[in-house]
């Protein structure tokens, strides 16, 4: 390699391009290849705290009251390098917490403030997150002081809570328990646009039809948290903005009342910044020069701080007293007429007509100067949209009710992605169970598990019926927002009992048998369903010549319909399940990509996904009894036949349709088996084939069974946060 000789004059001895994005990656060369990286995130190799670090144990050492005092003191400790507006950082800290939690979307449970992901790209450099890097730097001395006893994820949300409390709001509560990640998430789809703040209708737009927002997205533009504050595509029209708000907030699991409360409560304090030229700002943190040390949007042309700060481009406060919690927002919004104007930075905003001098907020640095308050197009939507207006009027007339609704909505916003209360920690956890937490009562643990297994084994249910039902119950789990799973046995309730993918007729038959056993044994149906799956696997392993006991942890409870938000659970309905070789219909996304997404939500690794596919196929668990991918003559025995036959070169593979293939004997031309894309990707993709070959080896038959059991148990216990 003459061009890279270490001794050559003036040349770097490091291979050029290998350590940066200058070289082409495999995904650049083969963009249609499966990106298995989404299954291999956030492991101990990237975590500087090590594999043995236990955040919950560290939390037990935390002096919560001291931390809260330090945060409240921070609010009014203005720093010269980034001065606090009116001497109070509350508005900035609330915006940081809002924008951390506000990326959550209900469709796939991804986003949100549960991982501290705002520290990393792309979120740390989203246009809507401009200058939140300053908020995190202001928090750094506190993080440094308390160290491992408080995660960045918890600290950012708690800072928002303390900001509100320091300005007079009685918050609903707070739970610790969010664990930090250490690199950007690779599984979250933020949109296909190639530029920030791309308008709808352009290339790779997230909108189609009559402004139909692409699923699972919950924000109107690449780089915004929810709606464009200047109006749809930057064109002011409060009624159209109201439509966007209704869609985006619904996709964050909020109703109209919560939407009005969160918008108003978020704008009751603080201000927007646009008193200058946006063109004077430097690159975002991810694109800034080395010497900027991770700070972005720096203004080296003009003063750029205090009253001269530019962030969103919109300029001004919403209320007369932006550092206290009160009802001035609704007073100003509803008492005055408002007219369109532009900020010094050129952004559209609304200002009041003939406002009283005493209703104007003072300058952030000089209290002798007063300016007009402002409203964004989203604020005006609360006044113009008929339904939002009714809610706003009620909040205006009843400030106490507004404060209560906001406090609850803020708690929901900042905790929705944490999952069940079993994950909550700390002295301020509310005692009340909330329906959006998907509450599940505790189940019995003190019973004879083997006696129940014996009843199940004698029930007449087939291996396929037992395993399929247990899988369907557990597969709803989402590691993103910790919802779903087998605990609660909601598979027997609406809407899950009627989902097409759950085969209602087969499900009803199996549940009738298992519910009777559960009642006789005095245990939960949830435990019985999982136990039945385990019994089926043990029988199948024995048929393959391997004796194994599938681990089981009793204690699941049974949720009631009163504890179940039916509409909220609709988003958990599987559109496809590669593990049971099923999809509801053909989609633009390939079946193997949907399998990968499901595996990631289940928190499976690629080897775990592989071994589960091979086992589920030979157990005969395909939807509707389909024979696709059942590469065995011993259905019901937990053998490695799927992998043996998939890698056997005495067969060829021929497409017969969009998602169907035939496995043909090379010599005779006889069709031996049929398959789908999900089956054949394990022989096509080079990485998955490497795993498949491991399980096809003669010396790994027992390893296959043990690995299948381990992966199965991981899925069955995915939602058992009470065991952690």
Curated annotation (Swiss-Prot):
UniProt-annotated binding residues for heme b: 267
Keyword vocabulary terms for this entry: Heme, Hydrogen peroxide, Iron, Metal-binding, Oxidoreductase, Peroxidase
GO molecular function: catalase activity; heme binding; metal ion binding
PROSITE patterns noted in UniProt: PEROXIDASE_2 (PS00436), PEROXIDASE_4 (PS50873)
Entry EC number(s): 1.11.1.21
Reaction equations catalysed: H2O2 + AH2 = A + 2 H2O; 2 H2O2 = O2 + 2 H2O
Residues flagged as site, Transition state stabilizer: 95
InterPro entries: Catalase_peroxidase, Haem_peroxidase, Haem_peroxidase_sf, Peroxidases_AS
Broadest EC class assigned to this enzyme: oxidoreductase
Location in chain, cross-link Tryptophyl-tyrosyl-methioninium (Trp-Tyr) (with M-252): 98-226
Cofactor: heme b
Record has Nucleotidyltransferase as a keyword: no
Record location of the Tryptophyl-tyrosyl-methioninium (Tyr-Met) (with W-98) cross-link: 226-252
Post-translational modification: Formation of the three residue Trp-Tyr-Met cross-link is important for the catalase, but not the peroxidase activity of the enzyme.
A GO CC annotation given for this chain: cytosol
Cofactor binding remark: Binds 1 heme b (iron(II)-protoporphyrin IX) group per dimer.
GO BP: any one term: cellular response to hydrogen peroxide
Family as reported in the entry's similarity comment: Belongs to the peroxidase family. Peroxidase/catalase subfamily.
Subunit structure, interactors included: Homodimer or homotetramer.
Role summary: Bifunctional enzyme with both catalase and broad-spectrum peroxidase activity.
HAMAP family: Catal_peroxid (MF_01961)
Protein name: Catalase-peroxidase
Species whose genome carries this gene: Vibrio cholerae serotype O1 (strain ATCC 39541 / Classical Ogawa 395 / O395)
């Amino acid at each position: 390699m003459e061009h890279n000789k270490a001794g050559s004059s003036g040349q770097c001895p490091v291979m050029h391009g290998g350590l940066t994005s200058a070289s082409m990656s495999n995904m650049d060369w083969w963009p249609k290849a499966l990106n298995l990286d989404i299954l291999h995130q956030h492991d101990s190799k990237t975590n500087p705290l090590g594999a043995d670090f236990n955040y919950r144990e560290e939390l037990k050492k935390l002096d919560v009251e001291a931390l809260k005092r330090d945060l409240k003191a921070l609010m009014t400790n203005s720093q010269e390098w980034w001065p606090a507006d009116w001497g109070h950082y509350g508005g900035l800290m609330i915006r940081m917490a809002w924008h951390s939690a506000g990326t959550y979307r209900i469709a796939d449970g991804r986003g949100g403030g549960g991982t501290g992901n705002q520290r990393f790209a792309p979120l740390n450099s989203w246009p809507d997150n401009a200058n939140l890097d300053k908020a995190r730097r202001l928090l750094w001395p506190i993080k440094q002081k308390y160290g491992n006893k408080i995660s960045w994820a918890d600290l950012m949300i708690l800072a928002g809570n303390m900001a509100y409390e320091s300005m007079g709001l009685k918050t609903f509560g707070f739970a610790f328990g969010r664990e930090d990640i250490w690199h950007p998430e690779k599984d979250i789809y933020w949109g296909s646009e190639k530029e920030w703040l791309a308008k709808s209708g352009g290339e790779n737009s997230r909108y189609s039809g009559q402004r139909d927002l692409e699923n699972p997205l919950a924000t109107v533009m690449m780089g915004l948290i929810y709606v464009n504050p200047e109006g749809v595509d930057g064109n002011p029209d409060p009624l159209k903005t109201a439509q966007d708000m209704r869609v985006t907030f619904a996709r964050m699991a909020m109703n109209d009342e919560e939407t009005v409360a969160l918008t108003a409560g978020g704008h009751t304090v603080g201000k927007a910044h646009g008193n200058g030229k946006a063109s004077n700002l430097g690159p975002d943190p991810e694109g800034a020069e080395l010497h900027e040390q991770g700070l972005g949007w720096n203004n080296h042309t003009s003063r750029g701080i205090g009253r001269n700060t530019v962030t969103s481009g919109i300029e001004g406060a919403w209320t007369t007293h932006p550092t206290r919690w009160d009802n001035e927002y609704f007073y100003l919004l509803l008492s005055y007429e408002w007219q369109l104007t532009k900020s010094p930075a050129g952004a559209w905003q609304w200002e009041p007509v003939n406002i009283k001098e005493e209703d104007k907020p003072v300058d952030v640095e000089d209290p002798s100067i007063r300016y007009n308050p402002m409203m964004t197009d989203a604020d005006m939507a609360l006044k113009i949209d008929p339904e939002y207006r009714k809610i706003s009027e009620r909040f205006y007339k009843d400030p106490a009710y507004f404060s209560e609704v906001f406090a609850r909505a803020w708690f929901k916003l900042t905790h929705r992605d944490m999952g069940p209360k079993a994950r909550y920690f700390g002295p301020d956890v509310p005692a009340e169970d909330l329906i959006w937490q998907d509450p599940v009562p505790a189940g019995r643990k003190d019973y004879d598990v083997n006696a129940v297994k014996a009843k199940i084994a004698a029930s007449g249910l087939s291996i396929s019926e037992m395993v399929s039902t247990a899988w369907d119950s557990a597969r709803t789990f989402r590691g993103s927002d910790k919802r779903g799973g087998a605990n609660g046995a909601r598979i027997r309730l609406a809407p899950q009992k009627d989902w097409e993918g759950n085969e209602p007729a087969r499900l009803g038959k199996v549940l009738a048998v298992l519910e009777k056993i559960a009642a006789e044994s005095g245990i939960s149906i949830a435990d019985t369903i999982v136990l039945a799956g385990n019994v089926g696997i043990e029988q199948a392993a024995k048929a393959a010549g391997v004796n194994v006991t599938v681990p089981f942890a009793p204690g699941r409870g049974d949720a009631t319909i009163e504890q179940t938000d039916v509409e909220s659970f609709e988003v958990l309905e599987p559109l496809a399940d590669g593990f049971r070789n099923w999809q509801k219909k053909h989609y633009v996304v390939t079946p193997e990509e949907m399998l990968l997404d499901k595996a990631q939500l289940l928190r499976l690794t690629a080897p775990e996904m592989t071994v589960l596919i091979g086992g589920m196929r030979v157990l005969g668990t395909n939807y509707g009894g389909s024979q696709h991918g059942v590469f065995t003559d011993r259905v019901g025995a937990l053998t490695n036949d799927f992998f043996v036959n998939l890698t056997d070169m005495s067969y060829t593979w021929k497409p017969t349709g969009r998602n169907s293939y035939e496995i043909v004997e090379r010599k005779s031309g006889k069709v031996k088996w049929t398959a789908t894309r999900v089956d054949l990707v394990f022989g096509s993709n080079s990485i998955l084939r490497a795993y498949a070959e491991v399980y096809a080896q003669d010396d790994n038959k027992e390893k296959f069974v043990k690995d299948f059991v381990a992966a199965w148990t991981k899925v069955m216990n995915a939602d058992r946060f009470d065991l952690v």
